[in-house]
Curated annotation (Swiss-Prot):
Signal peptide (residue range): none
Region: Disordered, residue numbers: 1-90, 272-413, 575-597, 835-854
N-acetylglycine: residues carrying this PTM: 2
Record-listed Omega-N-methylarginine modification sites: 833, 840, 850
Protein name (record): Serrate RNA effector molecule homolog
Placement of covalent cross-link Glycyl lysine isopeptide (Lys-Gly) (interchain with G-Cter in SUMO2): 150
Family statement: Belongs to the ARS2 family.
Residues modified as Phosphotyrosine: 8
Modified residues annotated as Phosphothreonine in this record: 544, 671
Length: 876
């Protein structure tokens, strides 16, 4: 009786199980099956005959191994594929069709290949967020990739042979212009409803934004002038050894910006006294931790403990002052105070238990699933405690209001307005508005403001966000409550934002040299003048008459600035001394050996420069020595966070060439900040498709004038019928004037976007150029791309393979394949069941026969090279 199908399948499975468990028998069967493969058989037999000791003759550095050889970064080896199901050199039998094979698989939609062939890479989508790049690519809807501009060579293929070269170039330029115009219009339609885009270009939103920015600038200017009048800048120098004084000045500026008074500035003195009253070794430790670029866990915890101690001291001072006030109120208040203290003790014990379990997870800004499950049962308790905290925090506010009435003679305690707590949200979708985040976070006590970064084109225009709270709140509890909240199907996933570690950072000490300082004064004054003009900061208010253009700027720090830009030389004295037989003039330095000079420091010039730099930093949020502008700093958690200053004096003498090189490089870095914001000229705007408001209104009226029949016309906006088109037109202008205004605003909206020379756009996609025949690259690198560690993952364009990690690729040059077939066929998807060829160097050249059961040869390949022969790249 014949076996059933089930029995046959079971036996087949048993056969493969035996092959996997009994490796020697499978190898012998494979040798019998491949009788013609003499090389493999001989190598395997030799391997059986040799003992472990004999292997040491080939490579004495080889480590003794008693387990099967592990290939690093490779999966466990499975059953090897046989001749009948493997076509490594035949593209027509591949298991998965590559882009060039004409199949349905597009370049960006292949299945994930974590251990695939070195030639088969997952094509990186240029606008994927980090979660999509770290997860499976099959789970993400990549959308339709944008069209790629044709190269001139590709464009010529679409032209008739009769077209001459001049006409072809002209047509190609027209094609490029049309392509860019279409790309821009598509981008406008795709993003015009998003808040970040409307706030930049919509006429209604632009006016509000400018007004807010002007108000913030004027507030910063008032703070700067107030600090200057109070003498904060008199003895302040922007040198790294004055870091503590610089931080104190920045904190004073922040307190003033937050609406603080002179009384609130006293808290800076109290902090200094507390630091000095602490252990004598503590300040040195804190300075060391500030200087280090990254803190270890132990150091971070120590700093947190110090901060907690300082907060505890402040709380004790507050409670002692409250006791003095409450003693005068009577015995009844004492009983209430006892009850309050008991409640606080209970609450603090609960909070300590809860903080114990969650501290480590919150430090990293993420919570594990096990913790979320274990703490999910405490949700009701947390709500009750949150209500208690709200009530208890409202009580002190009421008491503070009553204090001035009861005890007008007592002074208010200074507030630490320069310190905040904040949350960081890495991925905020472009369709989420700022108002939605504000309404979500307003529910928690101590909320102050929200800051959103500029959208990132390479990350699907996702933005980063910072939510700032008062220093008194429990930021980790708020972070926990916001963990699993979704806005418009987007998880906010907040994390606690740590305080800045090094607020004062230094650059090269060569900047102390007199010649460089004078050049910096010139550049800084130019920057101040440019930014003041751009923001109209010193311009008169709209109601007041304008000043004549000949009058100088009203900015007080630019007064008499030219006196310091002119270098004084004693040319007459030198001439007289030289002609009267004095010392001969010094020979000019030779070009080959430039003369070295000492760093010369001029305190007077440095004082003038520092006032300019502080004006730029506080008023315009521009860090001069870092050559960058900090955008939206008023909305960030730290309103004056980081500043770069001059480093220590260089120990060695400097050459004149070094000074000139520094000045040249620094001016190049400042050029983008000095350039006025560019906008397209009228001619360029017309070429790019600038719209005329009157023409667009005519188009709108025409499209809403429909003829139903003879002497019967319809206005679809209202559904009314008229005898002629002129009546419909009159009706639209009279009854639908708001629609006409909307059309005009839409035109202005588009034109504002078009005329911005720095308008956002998708990253430009350039097809990769295949390398020349003699171009050799290191193994594993794709030509036309930088090294893997130099390129962000999200910036890979469509249709271009991802560069593999060094050491993964085969030894031969693997050109990128933008279009058309490769010079040799790729291996099929998943060939080799783990693809060990790449690790043992078996993929050296196309069509090379594979040794199927070879695990790896410890011996180096012996090769013969004729030194007299011409260069050849085909050595093994």
């Amino acid at each position: 009786m014949g076996d059933s199908d089930d029995e046959y399948d079971r036996r087949r499975r048993d056969k493969f199980r035996r092959e996997r468990s009994d490796y020697d028998r499978s190898r012998e069967r494979d040798e019998r099956r491949r009788g013609d493969d003499w090389n493999d058989r001989e190598w395997d037999r030799g391997r059986e005959r040799r003992s472990r000791g004999e292997y040491r003759d080939y490579d004495r550095n080889r480590r003794e191994r008693f387990s099967p050889p592990r290939h690093e970064l490779s999966p466990p080896q499975k059953r090897m594929r046989r001749d009948w199901d493997e076509h490594s050199s035949d593209p027509y039998h591949s298991g998965y069709e590559m882009p060039y094979a004409g199949g349905g698989g597009g370049p960006a939609y292949g299945p994930p290949q974590p251990w695939g062939h070195p030639d088969v890479h997952i094509v990186q989508h240029p606008v994927l967020p980090i979660q999509a790049r770290l997860g499976s690519i099959a789970e993400i809807d990549l959308g339709v990739p944008p069209p790629v501009m044709k190269t001139f060579k590709e464009f010529l293929l679409s032209l008739d042979d009769a077209v001459d070269e001049t006409e072809a170039v002209k047509r190609y330029n027209d094609y490029k212009l049309d392509f860019r115009r279409q790309q821009m219009q598509d981008f406008f339609l795709a993003h015009k409803d998003e808040e970040w885009f409307r706030s930049k270009y919509h006429p209604d939103e632009v006016g509000k934004r400018r007004q807010e920015a002007r108000g913030a600038l004027q507030n910063r200017l008032r703070v700067f002038l107030s600090l200057m009048e109070s003498g904060w800048f008199d003895n302040l120098l922007l040198d790294i050894d004055k870091a503590d004084a610089i931080v104190k000045m920045l904190d004073a500026a922040v307190i003033k910006m937050e609406g603080g008074t002179e009384n609130d500035l006293r808290i800076l003195e109290q902090e200094e006294e507390e630091e000095q009253a602490g252990k004598p070794g503590e300040p040195n430790k804190k300075e060391e931790s500030r200087v280090g670029p990254g803190l270890g866990d132990g150091e971070r915890k120590a700093n947190e403990k110090d901060d907690k101690k300082e907060d505890g001291k402040q709380a004790e001072n507050e409670s002692s002052s409250d006791d003095k006030i409450k003693k005068s109120e009577g015995d009844g208040d004492k009983e209430e105070k006892k009850e309050d203290s008991e409640k606080e003790a209970k609450k603090s014990s609960k909070k300590r238990n809860r903080k114990h379990s969650g501290d480590d997870s919150f430090d990293e800004g993420s919570v594990s699933e096990s913790e979320s499950e274990s703490e999910s049962g405490q949700a009701e308790e947390e709500k009750e405690e949150a209500d208690e905290t709200l009530k208890e925090k409202e009580k002190p506010k009421e008491e503070e209001r009553e204090k001035p009435k009861d005890a007008p003679g007592l002074e208010c305690k200074p507030r630490p307005l320069h310190k905040t707590c904040s949350l960081f949200m890495r991925n905020i979708a472009p369709n989420i508005s700022r108002a939605e985040i504000i309404s979500l976070c307003k529910r928690y006590p101590g909320f102050m403001r929200v800051a959103l970064s500029e959208p990132q084109p390479e990350r699907r225009f996702f933005r980063r966000g910072w939510v700032t709270f008062d220093r008194s709140v429990n930021i980790k509890e708020i972070c926990w409550n916001l963990q699993n909240i979704r806005l418009r199907e987007c998880e906010l996933s907040p994390g606690v934002n740590r305080d800045l570690t090094r607020r004062v950072r230094n650059i090269n000490g060569i900047t102390q040299h007199k010649q460089i300082v004078r050049n910096d004064i010139k550049l800084a004054a130019k920057l101040v003048h440019t930014l003041d003009d751009r923001t109209q900061l010193w311009a008169p208010e709209p109601g007041t008459p304008a000043l004549p253009a000949s009058l100088p700027s009203q900015n007080p720090i630019l007064k008499n600035i030219t006196d310091y830009l002119i270098e004084e030389v004693s040319a007459e004295e030198e001439e007289l001394l030289g002609s009267s037989g004095g010392a001969p003039p010094e020979e000019p330095p030779k070009e080959g050996n430039p003369a070295e000079i000492n760093v010369e420091r001029d305190e007077k010039l440095i004082k003038v420069l520092d006032k300019l730099l502080l004006y730029l930093r506080i008023v315009h949020s521009l860090d001069y020595y870092n050559t960058c502008e900090y955008p939206n700093e008023d909305e960030m958690p730290n309103r004056c966070g980081i500043i770069h200053v001059r480093g220590p004096m260089p120990p060695n003498r400097i050459s004149h060439g070094e000074v000139l090189e520094w000045q040249k490089t620094f001016e190049e870095k400042l050029t983008p900040l000095l350039s006025v914001r560019e906008s397209l000229s009228e001619e360029e705007a017309q070429k790019m498709g600038r719209k005329d408001p009157e023409q667009e209104v005519e188009k709108f009226v025409t499209s809403n004038t429909q003829e139903l029949g003879k002497d019967k016309w319809l206005c679809p906006l209202s559904g009314k019928k008229f005898k002629g088109p002129e009546f419909v037109r009159k009706h639209i202008f009279n009854k639908h004037a708001e629609k006409i205004e909307e059309v005009k605003k839409e035109v202005a909206f588009f034109n504002n976007f078009l005329t911005d020379a720095k308008r956002p756009a998708l990253p430009e996609i350039k097809p990769a150029q295949p390398p020349g025949p003699a171009q050799i690259l290191p193994p594993g690198l794709t030509p036309g791309l930088p090294y893997p560690h130099q390129t962000p993952q999200g910036l890979m364009p469509y249709g271009q393979p991802r560069p593999p990690i060094l050491g993964y690729g085969a030894g031969a040059v693997r050109p990128a394949v933008p279009t058309g077939g490769p010079p040799y066929p790729h291996a099929p998807y998943g060939a080799g069941r783990g693809n060990y060829d790449a690790f043992r160097g078996q993929g050296g050249y196309p069509g090379k026969p594979r040794n199927r059961m070879v695990r790896g040869d410890p011996r180096a390949i012996v090769e013969y090279r004729d030194l007299d022969a011409p260069d050849d790249v085909d050595f093994f």
